[in-house]
Amino acid sequence: TGMKVVFTPVSDYAAVVESLATKKLDLAWLGGFTYVQAKIRTNGTAIPIVQRAEDAVFTSKFITADPAIKTLADLKGKTFAFGAPSSTSGSLMPRFFLQQDGLNPEKDFKTVAYSGAHDATVAFVAAGKADAGVLNTSVWDKLVESKKVDTSKVRVFATTPTYFDYNWTVRGDLDPAIIKKLKDAFLALDPSKPEHKAIMDLQRASKFVATESKNYDGIEAAGKSAGLLK
């Protein structure tokens, strides 16, 4: 785009939402639920512009090191780890799908823990701190590829249905011409060009596609049913 970019690190999901709302950030990479929180906090002005093609069909993986666990029903009476409480793929959507399968984590599991991060969930399960856990598929694949998880010990036993997840969101009061420029720059990224592929590889993206607010209505409904949104 030719624009100067200043990277602003944030401490957690809530800080990203607040920074967008208070105009400290113009553009942010958000999980689906964090986007919904940003939309609510900014009175509907935060705009999702693009997502990776993979984010339109995102999934989470349920993992275990316990040979007795083969299905979600086997989780009854077991210890379980989610990621961060407000993580779309590490907590909210897996919880929603568990409930659709008739499982209430707080009632049906022996204990429920929050590891705080996807890779930490794998560590919990590998170390026996939890009988099973759930994390986003992208992180699981990355850990497997980099041999940071022993797949002879920790294995996937279930996968969620697909849902929309991560996106790049802009604050809505940015100049529309700048928003269009940013969106077009993402959509123009071509993996056949090495300099473009280097950028895309950082986000494990095969390509970027346009997205819109209504794609996240399902996540908003899941957040309300979980009591995480008013």
Describe each region flagged by the PLM.
Residues 1-32:
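Extracytoplasmic small-molecule ligand-binding "clamshell" domains
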Residues 5-8, 77-81:
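Short, well-ordered beta-strand elements
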Residues 15, 34-35, 139-140, 215:
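Alpha-helix capping/helix-boundary segments
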Residues 20-21, 75, 125-126, 182:
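Hydrophobic residues within well-ordered alpha-helices
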Residues 26-31, 48, 131-136:
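Paired acidic/hydrophobic, glycine-rich loop segments that form the ligand-binding mouth/hinge
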Residues 48-71, 168-171:
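Hydrophobic/proline-rich hinge and linker segments of small-molecule sensing/allosteric domains
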Residues 68-70, 78-177:
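Pocket-lining segment of extracytoplasmic ligand-binding domains
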Residues 163-165, 169-230:
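An extracytoplasmic/periplasmic, membrane-proximal ligand-sensing/linker region
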